[in-house]
């Protein structure tokens, strides 16, 4: 058209996208962060932190499933003539989001109990196992100790109870 000029323009705001997934890292000796399928799996063998550096624009992609297992207690000693008892296992807590992580190791896991990530560092505590009892040189009964707690964010699993030495009463 000789009287009207046309300018071809595009609005780039319609094709701009934010982050699809959250970005996270782990700290601490022996702790790892790996990709399994479309999920990131953080494994802690010692204390450290799980740090969320950025979150996804879609809230569903900010769900964090978790499994927190505490340490077991130390077994009881039988001394020279009696038997000691075994100790208790450490506590187990699991939370997940069925749509993202349908697998569960627990028949009691709550269906939608995942934690929604926010940008922060989440402390991770790995409790030590309880110590065994030891008999005294004269054959008396020693005492064992309970396992220690493990925790992630606001989730805490109790340590297992200690064993009873032979001849001891509960």
Locate the predicted segments by residue.
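Glycine-biased low-complexity/repetitive sequence motifs
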Residues: 1-170
